Swiss-Prot record:
One of its GO terms (molecular function) is phosphoribosylformylglycinamidine cyclo-ligase activity. Keywords: ATP-binding, Cytoplasm, Ligase, Nucleotide-binding, Purine biosynthesis. The gene is purM. InterPro entries: PurM-like_C_dom (IPR010918), PurM-like_C_sf (IPR036676), PurM-like_N (IPR016188), PurM-like_N_sf (IPR036921), PurM_cligase (IPR004733). GO terms for biological process: 'de novo' IMP biosynthetic process; adenine biosynthetic process. It is found in: Cytoplasm. It catalyses: 2-formamido-N(1)-(5-O-phospho-beta-D-ribosyl)acetamidine + ATP = 5-amino-1-(5-phospho-beta-D-ribosyl)imidazole + ADP + phosphate + H(+). One of its GO terms (cellular component) is cytosol. This is Phosphoribosylformylglycinamidine cyclo-ligase.
Length: 336
C-alpha cells in the first residue's frame, strides 16, 4: 500500500507548488532572502532604527460557502489577505510578508491555483510578499470539493510611530472609509437569511444592484493599505478595522478610558445589500450594526484640525471617505 492509496497524493502536491511559484514570485520585494519551497522563508529587515513587528492571523469564514456554491475561487484569496493586512495597518504598521494555509480533503490543483492566485493578487495590492504557506491534503476531513483557508501577516512599524490611542480627545472626529460590501463577516447569518429563510438562489438577479446575488456576496474585501499610508504624518488617534462584531464591538477596542464614539447614522450611504438582509431577515438595527460593517470597512479617529487634509488625501488616492461621528465623553461604547 502507498500513501496515495490513503488519499494523499504527494506528486500532485509537488506539482501544485511548482504551479503557484510564479504567482508568489510576482509579489517578491526587497528583504525576501528565500521564499516558497524551503523549510522556512527568510526576510531581512533593513533601514529601521527601532522596529516593532506586528502580526495578525485570520480566515475567510463561511464566505467560502458562497465560493463553493458559485464554483468561483479566484477572489477568496484577496479576502484572506485583506482580513489580515487590514488588522496590521491599524496600529500604523506596513505589511511585510504573508503566509497562507490551504486545507482540503483532496487536492484539486486547478481549483487551488485559483485560490492562491487570489492570495498573490491580494499581496500585490497590499504591497507585501507571499513568502510561504502550507497545502494540507486531509482525506475524509472535509466535504468533497470544499476547503478551508487561513492567513498570517507580519508587518513592521517604528516604535515611536505606533498609533497612540491614549492621546484620543473629546472632539476628535471619526472618519469612515467605505467598504466594498459585506467583506468577510456575517456570512452564516447572510446564508440563513437568503437561502434558508427566503429560498433565494445564488443566481438570482438583484435589479437595484445590477448583479446576481452570488456576485454581490462574493465581492472581495477591500484592502486599505494605500489609503491608510497617505494619512501618515497626520494626528491619527486610532483606527479600527470593522469586521465581525461590526461598529459596536470593534470601535470600543481602540477607545481610551472616559470616551465614547458617537456615530451619525445617515452620514454615509449604506449599501443596498445591508437593507435587503435587514428586511428579509427581520433583523433589528442594533443587531445589524453588531454583525456587519454597514458600508464602512475602516474607521479612522483624527484630530478635528486635520479632517479636511485627511479627506483631501484620501480622495486623491480614490478612497471614498465620510465624516461619520465624533469622540464624546463616555464609558467606552458606541452611541448610534
Amino acid at each position: 500500500m502507498k500513501y496515495k492509496d490513503a488519499g494523499v497524493n504527494i506528486d500532485e502536491g509537488n506539482k501544485f507548488v511548482k504551479m503557484i511559484k510564479p504567482f508568489a514570485e510576482k509579489t517578491i520585494k526587497e528583504g525576501v532572502l528565500e521564499g516558497i519551497g524551503g523549510f522556512a522563508a527568510l526576510y531581512e529587515i533593513k533601514n529601521y532604527k527601532n522596529p516593532v513587528l506586528v502580526s495578525s492571523t485570520d480566515g475567510v469564514g463561511t464566505k467560502l460557502k458562497i465560493a463553493f456554491m458559485m464554483d468561483k475561487h479566484d477572489t477568496v484569496g484577496i479576502d484572506l489577505v485583506a482580513m489580515c493586512v487590514n488588522d496590521v495597518i491599524v496600529v500604523g504598521a506596513k505589511p511585510l510578508f504573508f503566509l497562507d494555509y490551504f486545507a482540503t480533503g483532496k487536492l484539486e490543483s486547478e481549483k487551488a491555483i485559483q485560490v492562491i492566485k487570489g492570495v498573490a493578487e491580494g499581496c500585490e495590492i497590499a504591497g507585501c510578499a507571499l513568502i510561504g504557506g502550507e497545502t494540507a491534503e486531509l482525506p475524509g476531513f472535509y466535504k468533497e470539493g470544499e476547503y478551508d483557508l487561513a492567513g498570517f501577516c507580519v508587518g513592521i512599524v517604528e516604535k515611536e510611530e505606533i498609533i497612540d490611542t491614549s492621546s484620543m480627545a473629546i472632539g476628535d472626529v471619526v472618519i469612515g472609509l467605505s467598504s466594498s460590501g459585506l467583506h468577510s463577516n456575517g456570512y452564516s447569518l447572510v446564508r440563513k437569511v437568503f437561502f434558508e429563510k427566503n429560498n433565494f438562489s445564488i443566481e438570482d438577479y438583484v435589479p437595484d444592484i445590477g448583479k446576481t446575488l452570488g456576485e454581490v456576496l462574493l465581492t472581495p474585501t477591500k484592502i486599505y493599505v494605500k489609503s491608510v499610508e497617505v494619512l501618515k504624518g497626520l494626528k491619527i488617534k486610532g483606527m479600527a478595522h470593522i469586521t465581525g462584531g461590526g461598529f459596536i464591538e470593534n470601535i470600543p477596542r481602540i477607545l481610551r478610558k472616559g470616551v465614547s464614539a458617537r456615530i451619525y447614522k445617515g452620514s454615509w450611504e449604506v449599501p443596498i445589500i445591508f437593507d435587503m438582509i435587514r428586511r428579509l431577515g427581520e433583523i433589528e438595527e442594533k443587531e445589524m450594526y453588531r454583525t456587519f460593517n454597514m458600508g464602512i470597512g475602516m474607521v479612522v479617529i483624527i484630530d478635528k484640525e486635520e479632517v479636511e487634509k485627511a479627506l483631501k488625501r484620501l480622495k486623491e488616492v480614490g478612497e471614498t471617505a465620510f465624516v461619520i461621528g465624533e469622540i464624546v465623553e463616555g464609558e467606552g461604547g458606541v452611541i448610534l
